[in-house]
Design a protein with these regions (language model features):
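N-terminal export leaders
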Residues: 1-10
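Sec/Tat signal peptide C-region and signal peptidase I cleavage site
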Residues: 18-23
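Extracellular/periplasmic catalytic domains that process cell-envelope and extracellular macromolecules
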Residues: 42-45, 72-74, 91, 169-174
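A short beta-strand-turn-helix
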Residues: 30-48
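Structural alpha/beta surface segment adjacent to cysteine/selenocysteine redox centers
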Residues: 51, 56, 62-138
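C-terminal cap of thioredoxin/glutaredoxin-like
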Residues: 5, 136-231
């Protein structure tokens, strides 16, 4: 079976149909799927955030990505991204490491753009060589020199593995896993649990409800969506 088609089938199997739900922050997941939820909170000073565990080779993540960006920009809330490269995918780990290179060594905004472009061109990247060629073209287009060795000391790979470890502690089992989180410790799962829906469009009403629910909190500063490093 074609690897790309097989990956799409797996992603489809992991995405459960959307079940109608009220737009509200429910608190701890009722199905008990998620374990250590202590990290499900916005960055300091923010009332609400979108938390995403993603795999750059995941077709469902590629479909959700522009919706995440649109929702975050519309409501002026940050996106906190965790890399969760699935072992069945050929090049997703290397792509995550290079995104970290851009974030840490070049420009976080360029790292965001790299992730967006990888998702947009995902269907044409079938191997590590394809990813290397895509990345070289991306760097040239943005006036950057391609490093001879991206991660000589393994620090960036360690950051990606640390993100993956956070996902394991939370009990992430599929990608994308998406939450809307509040600064009062409440959250709602948009995608990724065992029993709920998987429609990223739910981000809009849930973020709206979360902002109303936290309206008495200190106002959040309006800012652009930024990539966040987790160690």
């Amino acid at each position: 079976m074609n690897r790309r088609f097989a990956a799409a089938l797996v992603a489809g199997a992991l995405s459960l149909p959307f079940a109608a739900a009220h737009a509200q922050i429910l608190g701890p997941a009722s199905d008990g799927h998620f374990k250590d939820t202590s990290m499900l909170k916005p960055p300091a000073g923010q009332r609400v955030a979108v938390v995403v565990f993603e795999d750059l080779e995941c077709p469902a993540c590629a479909a959700a990505h522009p919706i995440e960006l649109q929702a975050a920009q519309q409501y002026h809330v940050p996106i906190v991204r965790y890399d969760f490269p699935l072992q069945m995918h050929v090049w997703s780990f290397e792509a995550a490491v290079f995104a970290r290179y851009l974030q840490d060594k070049v420009n976080p905004a360029l790292a965001d753009e790299y992730r967006t472009q990888v998702f947009r061109n995902q269907i044409s990247i079938a191997s590590k060589d394809d990813l290397q060629n895509f990345t070289k073209q991306f760097m040239q287009k943005h006036g950057q020199a391609m490093p001879f060795v991206v991660d000589p000391g393994g620090k960036l790979a360690g950051e990606v593995k640390a993100d993956y470890g956070v996902g394991l502690r939370l009990n992430v089992t599929r990608t994308p896993t998406i939450f809307v989180v509040e600064n009062n410790g409440h959250y709602e799962t948009i995608s990724g649990n065992e029993t709920g829906g998987a429609d990223p469009n739910r981000l809009f009403p849930v973020i709206d409800a979360a902002l109303k629910q936290t309206h008495n909190s200190a106002p959040a500063a309006v800012h652009t969506v930024a990539r966040t490093t987790h160690k």
